Amino acid sequence: WRVLGVTRQLEKERIDIFHGLSNELPLNIHKSEVKSIVTIHDLIFLRYPQYYHSIDRNIYTYKFRKACENADRIIAISECTKRDIIEYFGIPADKIEVVYQGCDTSFTHPVTEEKKREVRAKYQLPEHYILNVGSIEERKNALSAVQALTMLPEQIHLVIVGRHTEYTDKIERFIKENKLEERVHIISNVPFDDLPTFYQLAEIFVYPSRFEGFGIPIIEALYSGIPVVAATGSCLEEAGGPDSIYIHPDDIKGMANAFKQIYSDPERKKVMIEKGQIFAKRFSEEKQAEEILNIYKKLMR
């Protein structure tokens, strides 16, 4: 039905535009009168094929390529994703529009002191910590942040929020070998309502991922008023802006030095926070909606 039935239903209902929000379109929609748009989030399965099973890569490649070829317009969630669509699928640049994503509005306003006390007690969060949020997998590279922690004063901790995976086992082996059990806190199953407080209690946010389509956790951190240290190599500079600090994902010493710079220079930290919060405003839901609506209007001219 998703392949053939959707198009028949769209034509029956006399729909003007179909927008595929997650990388795919009905295969026959280009043969209909219905205009189509597809949003492509990333092509990580082509950029880093080693992280995917071959059958999944083949399915994704076929579906994503067909969607890009058949769509009237393509929305990429970053300039990085746009470049990948051009490189891997040979799509003309003028067919692709970049529309950045935002984050949930719960990250855009301060949590109460009572909520901070409640969350700190509930999860036994340390007084001074660097935060990492995201799925705990090889590509996300959280181990590098743990390694960098060994170069920092003992009172500084690392909190990693994410679901337990095989890669978590690798991190935990390093923690045990380096006697970091008291300084690294891996926390799973955090309710979304508690997540903004994790950010606002943190002193630094680190996102050492090797590759992302965009990087919403960075936007969450900027809105939350904490400085960001992120990896080079994909789109994270687009999310973090010019005042965050970027290091190569394998540069452990560089990451540790970035943390030290922030901790040792309160004025720089203040500037990073203030400019980061200003930069984050460009990712509002209102702006995203306006840009998508303009694409719809242009398509109907």
PLM ranges: what are they?
Residues 1-301:
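Carbohydrate transferase catalytic cores enriched for Leloir-type hexosyltransferases
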